[in-house]
Every structure is written in C-alpha cells, then in structure tokens.
Amino acid sequence: MADTSDFRNGMTFIWKDDLWEIVDFLHVKPGKGGAFVRTTLKNVKDGHEVEETFRAGAKVDEVRVERREHQYLYEDDYGLHFMDQESYEQFSMPPEQVEGREFLKEGGDVDIVFRADTEEPLRTEVPQKVDLEVTETTPGVKGDTAQGGDKPATLESGATIDVPLFINEGDVVRLNTETEEYETRVSAASTV
C-alpha cells in the first residue's frame, strides 16, 4: 500500500478495479480545508487519461512494473509481435496497447513494461528518437530552400511527418517520437 505522499510520475497503481499510471500530480495545501493531490492518470490498458483528485493521505495499491528491452518483429491479424532480447521469447500484444506503433520498424528496439507479479505486458515505450527512411515525398528542386518551408513525407514505418524541402526519397531522417517532428537528416539517399 502506498499513500499520496508516495505519488511520483510513472507510478502505477490499482484504482477503481483498473491499472492506472500517474502522468502528472500536484500537492495542494489550501488555506482552508484539508490538503489534497490533483492528478492526471492514464489507463494502462487503453491509454485514456482522466483528471482525479485524492485526499492527502489516501491509500492506493501500488503495482510494481519492470521495463525490458525487446525487438519489434512484425504485425499481423493477431497483433504486434516482439522478441525478448535476453531470452529470445516471442509474444504478441494487441495494437491498442502499443504506443507509438507508427514509429516502429521491423528489427527496431522498444521497451515493454510488464506487471512484475503476473508478467503481463502492459504497454510499449518507443525510443524518444528514431531513424527512419523516407519512402515517399515530392522531390526537392534547386532553389526551393531559399524561403525555407516543409513538405509531407511518408516514412518506412507508414508514419507521415513534415520535413524540410531538401529531404528526398531514400534519405534517413531522425525524428522525435514525443513531438512527432523531424529533427535532422541522418544520411542522404545514395545516387547509384
């Protein structure tokens, strides 16, 4: 059992017969009345967020979670398939439990969060920065970059982001998965 003084971002606990993760919290001590904690909680199973207020000292059942590195293998009708990097065990997860799946590429690394007591996979965490190849975009024309600007580009994972005009098909770009924005060109397409 934990109480509100133990709250921290990322803490997972059971509340209203479901697993919730603390996204954000704030301890409030008003001039009148008792103290309370205002929280933003994310449902671990389906990802929806709610705002909730707890009385100071309220008890919750904390759940221990573990993060382990896995390799993304492929997606099919049964879900997304992953392999444990240490034991080489494979398993699948339903698409709704896989955050950032539009940035996963076959063979790419991803952290999977497990419930420690039941070994149940709860969610995925893609790296903050990933390198992906541009598979489709309009070609850059000399002189286009004088004014700057962006154009849409489709990446090898299927995601579409805005990239600078000088990016061409075959270029590998680095993007931030949290903001879903282009950061830099990692390598230019070979012109063989």
Curated annotation (Swiss-Prot):
Annotated SMART domains: EFP, Elong-fact-P_C
Regions crossing the membrane: none
Pfam families: EFP, EFP_N, Elong-fact-P_C
Record bears the keyword Cytoplasm: yes
SUPFAM superfamilies (UniProt xref): Nucleic acid-binding proteins (SSF50249), Translation proteins SH3-like domain (SSF50104)
GO biological process, one term: peptide biosynthetic process
PROSITE patterns: EFP
Sorted UniProt keywords: Cytoplasm, Elongation factor, Protein biosynthesis
Annotated localization: Cytoplasm
Entry keyword Transcription regulation: no
A GO CC annotation given for this chain: cytoplasm
A single MF term (Gene Ontology): translation elongation factor activity
Source organism superkingdom: Bacteria
Pathway: Protein biosynthesis; polypeptide chain elongation
Residue numbers spanned by region Disordered: 133-157
Family according to the record: Belongs to the elongation factor P family.
NCBIfam families to which the protein is assigned, alphabetical: efp, PRK00529.1
Stated role: Involved in peptide bond synthesis. Stimulates efficient translation and peptide-bond synthesis on native or reconstituted 70S ribosomes in vitro. Probably functions indirectly by altering the affinity of the ribosome for aminoacyl-tRNA, thus increasing their reactivity as acceptors for peptidyl transferase.
Name this polypeptide is given: Elongation factor P
Chain's gene name: efp
